Design a protein with these regions (language model features):
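Enriched for short, Lys/Arg-rich terminal
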Residues: 2-4, 8-25, 58-64, 68-86
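PIN-domain endoribonuclease scaffold, especially VapC-family toxins
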Residues: 24-32
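A short, surface-exposed loop/turn module that caps and links secondary-structure elements
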Residues: 32-58
Length: 86
């Protein structure tokens, strides 16, 4: 499965590399779990965001991984910092 990053998500991911390695490890674990188990099953309490038409998993209490898989089976990372309601 190819991983494609929205520009803002990639910037957030790079920021985690210098800000918090523990969070970066958690994000990587969530991505691996999505690749293994799919959109709706696995760690991080997968949740469909009906208004955004995307999926969300908990990185921690304050941050969510927002993602989707397109028709070509590419995993799109939309955001990995903050909360979708922010």
């Amino acid at each position: 499965m190819n991983k494609l990053w929205a520009d803002v998500a990639w910037d957030e991911y790079l920021a985690w590399q210098s800000e918090d390695k523990k969070t970066l490890i958690r994000i990587n674990s969530l991505i691996k779990d999505i690749e293994t188990n799919g959109l709706a099953v696995g760690i991080g309490k997968p949740e469909f965001l009906k208004y955004l038409k995307r999926w969300s998993r908990r990185i921690d209490e304050k941050n969510r991984l927002i993602y989707d898989i397109d028709e070509n089976k590419n995993l799109w990372i939309i955001s990995c910092k903050g909360h979708y309601e922010d």
